[in-house]
Amino acid sequence: MSSFKSEYPFEKRKAESERICSQFENRVPVICERAEKSDIPEVDRRKYLVPADLTVGQFVYVIRRRIKLPAEKAIFIFVNDTLPPTAALMFAVYQEHKDKDGFLYVKYSGENTFGSEENQ
């Protein structure tokens, strides 16, 4: 699957995120894609409208369920190549890391491929 950014021009992505944010003020527009070279399944959809008060850990749980990942398999999500804190609210992560087009881009992987904030 090609990436959301490569499929849609910037102007279209920006217009869509602005429409979403004005229509759903307490939601965060998130694009969730599997990291390259990851061995876990592709998620069935990549666009999410996430409640602002959802934690990163709760979002990981949503993704885990959508890809039907067994409990013994690990999953990590990355925002700008860093591992966000599990207890962080998605709204706070969005405010800090949203793209110029207005979406928050999240990658997921079965391995800790990028390291964590403590290692950088």
UniProtKB/Swiss-Prot annotation:
Keywords: Autophagy, Cytoplasmic vesicle, Lipoprotein, Membrane, Protein transport, Transport, Ubl conjugation pathway, Vacuole. The keyword Protein transport applies. It is found in: Cytoplasmic vesicle, Autophagosome membrane; Vacuole membrane. Residues 116-120 form a propeptide. GO terms for cellular component: autophagosome membrane; cytoplasmic vesicle; fungal-type vacuole membrane. Gene3D superfamilies: Phosphatidylinositol 3-kinase Catalytic Subunit, Chain A, domain 1 (3.10.20.90). It is a lipid-anchor. Transmembrane segments: none annotated. The record marks G115, S116 as: Cleavage. Its main location: membrane. A lipid is attached at G115 (Phosphatidylethanolamine amidated glycine). The C-terminal 5 residues are removed by ATG4 to expose Gly-115 at the C-terminus. The C-terminal Gly is then amidated with phosphatidylethanolamine by an activating system similar to that for ubiquitin. GO terms for molecular function: phosphatidylethanolamine binding. Belongs to the ATG8 family. Ubiquitin-like modifier involved in autophagosome formation. With ATG4, mediates the delivery of the autophagosomes to the vacuole via the microtubule cytoskeleton. Required for selective autophagic degradation of the nucleus (nucleophagy) as well as for mitophagy which contributes to regulate mitochondrial quantity and quality by eliminating the mitochondria to a basal level to fulfill cellular energy requirements and preventing excess ROS production. Participates also in membrane fusion events that take place in the early secretory pathway. This is Autophagy-related protein 8. It comes from Eremothecium gossypii (strain ATCC 10895 / CBS 109.51 / FGSC 9923 / NRRL Y-1056) (Yeast). The gene is ATG8.
